[in-house]
Amino acid sequence: MLNFISKPVGCLKGEITVPGDKSISHRSIIFGAIAIGTSVIDGFLDGEDCIATLKAFQSMGVRIEGPDKQRVIIHGVGKYGLKQPQNIIDCGNSGTSMRLLAGLLAAQQFDSQLTGDESLLKRPMLRISRPLSQMGADVTTQDGKPPIVIKGGKKLNGIHYVMPEASAQVKSCLLLAGMYAEGQTKITENAVSRDHTERMLRTFSYPVQIQDGAIIIDCNGECHGTRLNIPGDISSAAFFIVAASITPGSDVLIRNVGINPTRTGIIHILTEMGADIRVLNQRAYGEEPVADLHIRYSQLKGIDIPASMVPLAIDEFPVIFIAAACAQGKTTLHGAKELRLKESDRIGAMVDGLNQLGVHAEGFDDGILIEGGSIQGGEVNSRGDHRIAMSFAIAGAVASAPVTIKNCANVATSFPSFVTTANMLHFQIEEYS
Protein backbone atom coordinates (compact mmCIF):
# COMPACT_ATOMS: atom_id res chain seq x y z
CA MET A 1 0.00 0.00 0.00
CA LEU A 2 1.34 3.44 -0.96
CA ASN A 3 1.08 6.12 1.73
CA PHE A 4 2.05 9.79 2.03
CA ILE A 5 3.53 11.82 4.87
CA SER A 6 3.00 15.56 4.40
CA LYS A 7 4.97 17.80 6.75
CA PRO A 8 4.35 21.43 7.71
CA VAL A 9 6.19 23.97 5.55
CA GLY A 10 6.85 27.69 5.43
CA CYS A 11 5.62 29.54 2.38
CA LEU A 12 5.10 28.01 -1.07
CA LYS A 13 6.78 29.74 -3.98
CA GLY A 14 7.45 28.91 -7.59
CA GLU A 15 6.06 28.30 -11.03
CA ILE A 16 4.59 24.99 -12.18
CA THR A 17 2.48 23.36 -14.84
CA VAL A 18 0.02 20.56 -14.15
CA PRO A 19 -0.73 17.52 -16.33
CA GLY A 20 -3.23 17.63 -19.17
CA ASP A 21 -6.93 17.74 -18.46
CA LYS A 22 -8.32 14.30 -17.69
CA SER A 23 -11.78 14.89 -19.13
CA ILE A 24 -10.37 16.22 -22.39
CA SER A 25 -7.74 13.46 -22.60
CA HIS A 26 -10.43 10.75 -22.41
CA ARG A 27 -12.48 12.42 -25.11
CA SER A 28 -9.51 13.00 -27.40
CA ILE A 29 -8.93 9.24 -27.53
CA ILE A 30 -12.60 8.43 -28.12
CA PHE A 31 -13.14 10.91 -30.94
CA GLY A 32 -9.72 10.33 -32.46
CA ALA A 33 -10.43 6.59 -32.59
CA ILE A 34 -13.71 6.97 -34.51
CA ALA A 35 -12.42 9.76 -36.74
CA ILE A 36 -11.42 9.42 -40.38
CA GLY A 37 -7.67 9.98 -40.56
CA THR A 38 -4.93 10.57 -38.03
CA SER A 39 -5.07 12.77 -34.93
CA VAL A 40 -2.08 14.13 -33.02
CA ILE A 41 -2.79 14.93 -29.37
CA ASP A 42 -0.31 16.91 -27.26
CA GLY A 43 -0.62 17.39 -23.50
CA PHE A 44 -2.30 14.00 -23.02
CA LEU A 45 -2.63 12.90 -19.39
CA ASP A 46 -0.89 9.55 -19.08
CA GLY A 47 -2.60 8.69 -15.80
CA GLU A 48 -4.17 5.28 -15.26
CA ASP A 49 -7.74 6.43 -16.02
CA CYS A 50 -6.96 7.81 -19.47
CA ILE A 51 -4.69 4.84 -20.24
CA ALA A 52 -7.71 2.60 -19.54
CA THR A 53 -9.62 4.42 -22.29
CA LEU A 54 -6.63 4.22 -24.63
CA LYS A 55 -6.23 0.48 -24.07
CA ALA A 56 -9.94 -0.08 -24.63
CA PHE A 57 -9.65 1.31 -28.15
CA GLN A 58 -6.46 -0.60 -28.83
CA SER A 59 -8.42 -3.73 -27.93
CA MET A 60 -10.98 -2.70 -30.57
CA GLY A 61 -8.38 -2.53 -33.32
CA VAL A 62 -7.37 1.13 -33.21
CA ARG A 63 -3.65 1.80 -33.68
CA ILE A 64 -2.49 4.33 -31.10
CA GLU A 65 1.12 5.46 -30.69
CA GLY A 66 2.28 6.72 -27.29
CA PRO A 67 1.87 8.34 -24.93
CA ASP A 68 5.40 9.63 -25.50
CA LYS A 69 6.20 12.92 -23.74
CA GLN A 70 2.45 13.54 -23.45
CA ARG A 71 1.94 13.04 -27.21
CA VAL A 72 -0.49 10.47 -28.58
CA ILE A 73 -1.00 9.70 -32.27
CA ILE A 74 -4.32 8.03 -33.07
CA HIS A 75 -4.95 6.33 -36.41
CA GLY A 76 -8.72 6.62 -36.60
CA VAL A 77 -10.87 3.84 -38.03
CA GLY A 78 -14.02 5.88 -38.67
CA LYS A 79 -17.42 5.63 -37.01
CA TYR A 80 -18.01 2.07 -38.15
CA GLY A 81 -14.48 0.67 -38.01
CA LEU A 82 -14.25 -0.61 -34.43
CA LYS A 83 -13.78 -4.35 -33.97
CA GLN A 84 -15.06 -6.62 -31.23
CA PRO A 85 -12.59 -6.79 -28.32
CA GLN A 86 -11.30 -10.27 -27.53
CA ASN A 87 -11.67 -9.73 -23.79
CA ILE A 88 -13.80 -7.86 -21.28
CA ILE A 89 -12.84 -4.17 -21.26
CA ASP A 90 -11.37 -3.23 -17.87
CA CYS A 91 -11.99 0.43 -17.03
CA GLY A 92 -9.96 0.25 -13.80
CA ASN A 93 -11.00 3.11 -11.51
CA SER A 94 -12.43 5.25 -14.31
CA GLY A 95 -16.12 6.05 -14.27
CA THR A 96 -15.61 8.33 -17.27
CA SER A 97 -14.20 5.45 -19.32
CA MET A 98 -17.08 3.16 -18.40
CA ARG A 99 -19.95 5.59 -18.94
CA LEU A 100 -18.68 7.09 -22.20
CA LEU A 101 -17.65 3.74 -23.66
CA ALA A 102 -21.09 2.33 -22.81
CA GLY A 103 -22.74 4.94 -25.02
CA LEU A 104 -20.41 4.22 -27.91
CA LEU A 105 -20.51 0.43 -27.56
CA ALA A 106 -24.31 0.37 -27.35
CA ALA A 107 -24.33 1.43 -31.01
CA GLN A 108 -21.84 -1.15 -32.32
CA GLN A 109 -22.61 -4.38 -34.17
CA PHE A 110 -20.73 -6.53 -31.65
CA ASP A 111 -21.27 -7.59 -28.04
CA SER A 112 -19.08 -6.17 -25.31
CA GLN A 113 -18.67 -6.05 -21.55
CA LEU A 114 -17.26 -3.38 -19.24
CA THR A 115 -15.85 -3.97 -15.77
CA GLY A 116 -13.60 -2.14 -13.31
CA ASP A 117 -11.93 -2.17 -9.93
CA GLU A 118 -13.62 -2.61 -6.55
CA SER A 119 -14.48 1.09 -6.31
CA LEU A 120 -15.92 1.35 -9.83
CA LEU A 121 -18.05 -1.77 -9.31
CA LYS A 122 -19.95 0.14 -6.59
CA ARG A 123 -20.83 3.16 -8.73
CA PRO A 124 -24.32 3.81 -10.15
CA MET A 125 -24.93 2.94 -13.81
CA LEU A 126 -28.73 3.06 -14.14
CA ARG A 127 -28.30 6.73 -14.99
CA ILE A 128 -26.87 5.60 -18.35
CA SER A 129 -28.49 2.19 -18.89
CA ARG A 130 -32.04 3.56 -18.64
CA PRO A 131 -31.79 6.28 -21.32
CA LEU A 132 -29.71 3.99 -23.55
CA SER A 133 -32.49 1.42 -23.29
CA GLN A 134 -34.98 4.13 -24.29
CA MET A 135 -32.89 4.56 -27.45
CA GLY A 136 -33.21 0.85 -28.21
CA ALA A 137 -29.91 -0.38 -26.79
CA ASP A 138 -29.56 -3.68 -24.95
CA VAL A 139 -27.56 -2.71 -21.85
CA THR A 140 -27.73 -4.65 -18.60
CA THR A 141 -26.13 -4.02 -15.20
CA GLN A 142 -25.83 -5.92 -11.93
CA ASP A 143 -28.54 -4.31 -9.80
CA GLY A 144 -27.73 -0.94 -11.33
CA LYS A 145 -23.97 -1.28 -10.92
CA PRO A 146 -21.14 -2.66 -13.09
CA PRO A 147 -20.20 -4.86 -14.79
CA ILE A 148 -22.14 -3.66 -17.84
CA VAL A 149 -23.09 -6.18 -20.53
CA ILE A 150 -23.95 -4.75 -23.96
CA LYS A 151 -25.57 -6.71 -26.78
CA GLY A 152 -24.62 -5.25 -30.15
CA GLY A 153 -26.50 -5.06 -33.42
CA LYS A 154 -29.40 -3.03 -32.04
CA LYS A 155 -30.95 -0.22 -34.06
CA LEU A 156 -30.85 2.97 -32.00
CA ASN A 157 -33.38 5.78 -32.30
CA GLY A 158 -32.84 9.35 -31.21
CA ILE A 159 -34.69 10.54 -28.12
CA HIS A 160 -35.32 13.80 -26.32
CA TYR A 161 -33.82 13.28 -22.88
CA VAL A 162 -34.21 15.80 -20.07
CA MET A 163 -31.30 15.39 -17.67
CA PRO A 164 -32.59 14.75 -14.12
CA GLU A 165 -29.35 16.16 -12.68
CA ALA A 166 -26.19 17.71 -14.07
CA SER A 167 -23.84 14.98 -15.33
CA ALA A 168 -21.34 15.45 -18.13
CA GLN A 169 -20.72 11.70 -18.19
CA VAL A 170 -24.37 10.83 -18.80
CA LYS A 171 -24.74 13.62 -21.36
CA SER A 172 -21.60 12.48 -23.18
CA CYS A 173 -22.69 8.84 -23.13
CA LEU A 174 -25.96 9.74 -24.85
CA LEU A 175 -24.30 12.06 -27.37
CA LEU A 176 -21.95 9.24 -28.40
CA ALA A 177 -24.91 6.90 -28.84
CA GLY A 178 -26.75 9.67 -30.69
CA MET A 179 -23.99 9.79 -33.31
CA TYR A 180 -25.31 6.38 -34.47
CA ALA A 181 -29.05 6.78 -33.80
CA GLU A 182 -31.74 7.34 -36.43
CA GLY A 183 -33.25 10.79 -36.11
CA GLN A 184 -32.23 13.52 -33.72
CA THR A 185 -30.96 12.99 -30.21
CA LYS A 186 -31.78 16.02 -28.08
CA ILE A 187 -30.48 16.42 -24.55
CA THR A 188 -31.87 19.18 -22.36
CA GLU A 189 -29.96 20.32 -19.28
CA ASN A 190 -31.62 22.13 -16.40
CA ALA A 191 -28.23 22.80 -14.81
CA VAL A 192 -24.93 23.36 -16.57
CA SER A 193 -22.41 20.49 -16.70
CA ARG A 194 -18.99 20.20 -18.30
CA ASP A 195 -19.20 20.84 -22.04
CA HIS A 196 -15.93 19.25 -23.19
CA THR A 197 -17.78 16.74 -25.38
CA GLU A 198 -19.64 19.46 -27.27
CA ARG A 199 -16.40 21.36 -27.81
CA MET A 200 -14.61 18.16 -28.84
CA LEU A 201 -17.29 17.38 -31.43
CA ARG A 202 -16.58 20.75 -33.04
CA THR A 203 -12.83 20.13 -32.85
CA PHE A 204 -13.31 16.88 -34.80
CA SER A 205 -15.69 18.62 -37.28
CA TYR A 206 -18.81 16.68 -36.22
CA PRO A 207 -22.02 18.73 -36.56
CA VAL A 208 -23.71 19.54 -33.25
CA GLN A 209 -26.32 22.16 -32.43
CA ILE A 210 -26.58 23.94 -29.10
CA GLN A 211 -29.71 26.03 -28.50
CA ASP A 212 -31.81 27.05 -25.51
CA GLY A 213 -30.06 24.73 -23.06
CA ALA A 214 -30.30 21.74 -25.39
CA ILE A 215 -27.69 19.81 -27.37
CA ILE A 216 -28.85 18.22 -30.63
CA ILE A 217 -26.97 15.60 -32.64
CA ASP A 218 -27.74 13.00 -35.31
CA CYS A 219 -26.01 10.24 -37.26
CA ASN A 220 -25.36 12.30 -40.40
CA GLY A 221 -21.80 13.29 -39.63
CA GLU A 222 -18.24 12.05 -39.44
CA CYS A 223 -15.33 12.93 -37.18
CA HIS A 224 -12.18 13.98 -38.99
CA GLY A 225 -8.65 13.65 -37.65
CA THR A 226 -7.14 16.78 -36.17
CA ARG A 227 -4.31 18.22 -34.08
CA LEU A 228 -5.15 19.06 -30.50
CA ASN A 229 -3.28 20.63 -27.59
CA ILE A 230 -4.79 19.74 -24.20
CA PRO A 231 -4.62 22.40 -21.45
CA GLY A 232 -3.57 21.69 -17.88
CA ASP A 233 -6.28 20.18 -15.69
CA ILE A 234 -7.88 22.74 -13.37
CA SER A 235 -8.87 19.83 -11.10
CA SER A 236 -5.15 19.13 -10.59
CA ALA A 237 -4.28 22.83 -10.36
CA ALA A 238 -6.93 23.10 -7.62
CA PHE A 239 -4.67 21.50 -5.03
CA PHE A 240 -2.03 24.18 -5.51
CA ILE A 241 -4.55 27.02 -5.84
CA VAL A 242 -5.81 26.10 -2.37
CA ALA A 243 -2.32 25.43 -1.00
CA ALA A 244 -1.05 28.88 -1.99
CA SER A 245 -4.24 30.50 -0.67
CA ILE A 246 -3.92 28.99 2.84
CA THR A 247 -0.14 28.95 3.39
CA PRO A 248 1.10 32.34 4.70
CA GLY A 249 3.60 34.12 2.47
CA SER A 250 2.90 31.95 -0.57
CA ASP A 251 3.18 33.19 -4.17
CA VAL A 252 2.58 30.59 -6.90
CA LEU A 253 2.12 30.76 -10.69
CA ILE A 254 0.44 27.85 -12.51
CA ARG A 255 0.79 28.06 -16.28
CA ASN A 256 -1.46 26.76 -19.09
CA VAL A 257 -4.53 25.86 -17.02
CA GLY A 258 -7.84 25.15 -18.73
CA ILE A 259 -10.45 27.68 -17.61
CA ASN A 260 -13.51 26.26 -19.35
CA PRO A 261 -16.41 28.17 -17.69
CA THR A 262 -18.10 24.87 -16.77
CA ARG A 263 -15.04 24.03 -14.64
CA THR A 264 -14.12 27.27 -12.87
CA GLY A 265 -16.31 26.87 -9.80
CA ILE A 266 -13.23 26.58 -7.63
CA ILE A 267 -12.02 30.03 -8.68
CA HIS A 268 -15.44 31.57 -7.98
CA ILE A 269 -15.80 29.84 -4.60
CA LEU A 270 -12.30 30.66 -3.36
CA THR A 271 -12.56 34.26 -4.57
CA GLU A 272 -15.81 34.60 -2.62
CA MET A 273 -13.90 33.27 0.41
CA GLY A 274 -11.33 36.04 -0.06
CA ALA A 275 -8.61 34.29 -2.07
CA ASP A 276 -6.14 36.32 -4.13
CA ILE A 277 -6.31 34.63 -7.55
CA ARG A 278 -5.44 36.45 -10.76
CA VAL A 279 -6.30 34.99 -14.17
CA LEU A 280 -3.59 36.06 -16.61
CA ASN A 281 -2.73 35.69 -20.31
CA GLN A 282 -6.10 34.33 -21.40
CA ARG A 283 -6.03 32.50 -24.72
CA ALA A 284 -7.41 29.35 -26.35
CA TYR A 285 -6.19 25.85 -27.17
CA GLY A 286 -8.57 25.14 -30.01
CA GLU A 287 -12.08 25.24 -28.52
CA GLU A 288 -10.87 25.36 -24.90
CA PRO A 289 -10.00 28.58 -23.01
CA VAL A 290 -6.65 28.61 -21.19
CA ALA A 291 -4.89 30.98 -18.78
CA ASP A 292 -2.06 31.31 -16.28
CA LEU A 293 -3.16 31.50 -12.63
CA HIS A 294 -1.28 33.63 -10.10
CA ILE A 295 -2.20 32.84 -6.49
CA ARG A 296 -1.00 34.58 -3.34
CA TYR A 297 -1.80 33.86 0.28
CA SER A 298 -4.86 35.58 1.71
CA GLN A 299 -6.83 34.99 4.91
CA LEU A 300 -10.01 33.18 3.87
CA LYS A 301 -13.47 33.48 5.41
CA GLY A 302 -16.19 30.85 5.62
CA ILE A 303 -19.15 31.12 3.24
CA ASP A 304 -22.37 29.35 2.29
CA ILE A 305 -21.44 27.78 -1.05
CA PRO A 306 -24.33 28.19 -3.53
CA ALA A 307 -25.78 24.93 -4.87
CA SER A 308 -25.38 26.40 -8.37
CA MET A 309 -21.62 25.95 -7.94
CA VAL A 310 -21.86 22.18 -7.40
CA PRO A 311 -21.60 21.02 -11.04
CA LEU A 312 -18.90 23.64 -11.69
CA ALA A 313 -16.63 22.35 -8.89
CA ILE A 314 -17.76 18.77 -8.34
CA ASP A 315 -14.25 17.27 -8.39
CA GLU A 316 -12.63 20.11 -6.46
CA PHE A 317 -14.77 20.01 -3.31
CA PRO A 318 -12.41 17.80 -1.28
CA VAL A 319 -9.64 20.39 -1.47
CA ILE A 320 -12.13 23.27 -1.14
CA PHE A 321 -13.06 21.66 2.20
CA ILE A 322 -9.38 21.95 3.21
CA ALA A 323 -9.58 25.67 2.40
CA ALA A 324 -12.73 25.89 4.53
CA ALA A 325 -10.90 24.22 7.43
CA CYS A 326 -8.39 27.09 7.35
CA ALA A 327 -10.95 29.87 6.93
CA GLN A 328 -12.37 32.14 9.61
CA GLY A 329 -15.92 31.07 10.43
CA LYS A 330 -18.22 28.38 9.09
CA THR A 331 -18.51 27.05 5.56
CA THR A 332 -21.60 25.13 4.47
CA LEU A 333 -22.53 23.25 1.31
CA HIS A 334 -25.86 21.69 0.30
CA GLY A 335 -27.10 20.19 -2.97
CA ALA A 336 -24.00 18.03 -3.43
CA LYS A 337 -25.35 14.51 -2.90
CA GLU A 338 -23.34 13.42 -5.96
CA LEU A 339 -20.19 13.66 -3.80
CA ARG A 340 -21.32 10.51 -2.00
CA LEU A 341 -21.26 8.58 -5.31
CA LYS A 342 -17.73 9.33 -6.45
CA GLU A 343 -14.64 7.09 -6.14
CA SER A 344 -15.49 7.15 -2.45
CA ASP A 345 -18.18 8.79 -0.36
CA ARG A 346 -16.30 12.08 -0.46
CA ILE A 347 -18.48 13.79 2.13
CA GLY A 348 -17.95 10.94 4.59
CA ALA A 349 -14.24 10.67 3.82
CA MET A 350 -13.62 14.39 4.30
CA VAL A 351 -15.70 14.65 7.48
CA ASP A 352 -13.84 11.71 9.01
CA GLY A 353 -10.43 12.99 7.93
CA LEU A 354 -11.02 16.56 9.09
CA ASN A 355 -12.28 15.36 12.47
CA GLN A 356 -9.15 13.21 12.79
CA LEU A 357 -7.09 16.38 12.28
CA GLY A 358 -8.94 18.38 14.92
CA VAL A 359 -11.30 20.27 12.61
CA HIS A 360 -15.01 20.26 13.44
CA ALA A 361 -16.92 19.00 10.41
CA GLU A 362 -20.43 17.56 10.08
CA GLY A 363 -21.82 15.69 7.10
CA PHE A 364 -25.34 16.01 5.72
CA ASP A 365 -27.01 13.76 3.19
CA ASP A 366 -26.22 16.33 0.49
CA GLY A 367 -23.40 18.41 1.94
CA ILE A 368 -21.18 19.46 4.80
CA LEU A 369 -20.57 22.03 7.52
CA ILE A 370 -16.98 22.94 8.43
CA GLU A 371 -15.89 25.23 11.25
CA GLY A 372 -12.65 26.88 10.26
CA GLY A 373 -9.69 26.99 12.57
CA SER A 374 -6.38 25.19 12.64
CA ILE A 375 -5.42 21.76 11.33
CA GLN A 376 -3.60 19.38 13.66
CA GLY A 377 -1.28 16.56 12.71
CA GLY A 378 -2.54 13.00 12.55
CA GLU A 379 -3.42 10.09 10.30
CA VAL A 380 -6.24 9.85 7.76
CA ASN A 381 -7.38 7.17 5.33
CA SER A 382 -7.99 8.32 1.77
CA ARG A 383 -10.31 5.34 1.17
CA GLY A 384 -8.37 4.74 -2.03
CA ASP A 385 -9.68 8.00 -3.52
CA HIS A 386 -7.06 10.04 -5.38
CA ARG A 387 -8.66 13.42 -4.65
CA ILE A 388 -9.06 12.69 -0.93
CA ALA A 389 -5.40 11.64 -0.74
CA MET A 390 -4.10 14.77 -2.47
CA SER A 391 -6.39 17.06 -0.47
CA PHE A 392 -5.04 15.84 2.86
CA ALA A 393 -1.49 16.08 1.50
CA ILE A 394 -2.23 19.79 1.00
CA ALA A 395 -3.56 19.98 4.57
CA GLY A 396 -0.23 18.68 5.85
CA ALA A 397 1.54 21.82 4.64
CA VAL A 398 -0.36 24.00 7.12
CA ALA A 399 -0.91 21.47 9.91
CA SER A 400 0.69 21.79 13.34
CA ALA A 401 2.45 18.43 12.85
CA PRO A 402 2.89 15.92 10.00
CA VAL A 403 -0.18 14.36 8.39
CA THR A 404 -0.01 10.72 7.31
CA ILE A 405 -2.36 9.73 4.48
CA LYS A 406 -3.01 6.02 3.96
CA ASN A 407 -3.91 4.23 0.72
CA CYS A 408 -2.69 6.74 -1.88
CA ALA A 409 -1.86 4.53 -4.88
CA ASN A 410 -4.85 5.80 -6.87
CA VAL A 411 -3.27 9.25 -7.13
CA ALA A 412 -1.71 7.70 -10.24
CA THR A 413 -5.16 7.64 -11.89
CA SER A 414 -5.21 11.41 -12.37
CA PHE A 415 -1.91 13.01 -11.27
CA PRO A 416 1.05 10.59 -11.35
CA SER A 417 3.54 13.44 -10.82
CA PHE A 418 1.68 14.99 -7.87
CA VAL A 419 4.39 14.54 -5.24
CA THR A 420 7.17 15.72 -7.57
CA THR A 421 5.16 18.79 -8.61
CA ALA A 422 4.21 19.63 -5.01
CA ASN A 423 7.78 19.40 -3.80
CA MET A 424 8.87 21.83 -6.55
CA LEU A 425 6.85 24.42 -4.60
CA HIS A 426 8.66 23.46 -1.35
CA PHE A 427 6.11 21.01 -0.01
CA GLN A 428 7.60 18.22 2.07
CA ILE A 429 5.67 15.15 0.97
CA GLU A 430 7.23 11.71 1.23
CA GLU A 431 5.93 8.42 -0.15
CA TYR A 432 6.33 5.12 1.67
CA SER A 433 4.91 1.60 1.48
Curated annotation (Swiss-Prot):
3-phosphoshikimate binds at K22, S23, R27, S167, Q169, D315, K342. One of its GO terms (cellular component) is cytoplasm. The active site is at D315. It catalyses: 3-phosphoshikimate + phosphoenolpyruvate = 5-O-(1-carboxyvinyl)-3-phosphoshikimate + phosphate. Pathway: Metabolic intermediate biosynthesis; chorismate biosynthesis; chorismate from D-erythrose 4-phosphate and phosphoenolpyruvate: step 6/7. GO terms for biological process: amino acid biosynthetic process; aromatic amino acid family biosynthetic process; chorismate biosynthetic process. The keyword Transferase applies. It is an enzyme of class 2 (transferase). Phosphoenolpyruvate binds at K22, G95, R123, Q169, R346, R387. Catalyzes the transfer of the enolpyruvyl moiety of phosphoenolpyruvate (PEP) to the 5-hydroxyl of shikimate-3-phosphate (S3P) to produce enolpyruvyl shikimate-3-phosphate and inorganic phosphate. Belongs to the EPSP synthase family. PANTHER family: AROM/DEHYDROQUINATE SYNTHASE, PENTAFUNCTIONAL AROM POLYPEPTIDE. This is 3-phosphoshikimate 1-carboxyvinyltransferase.
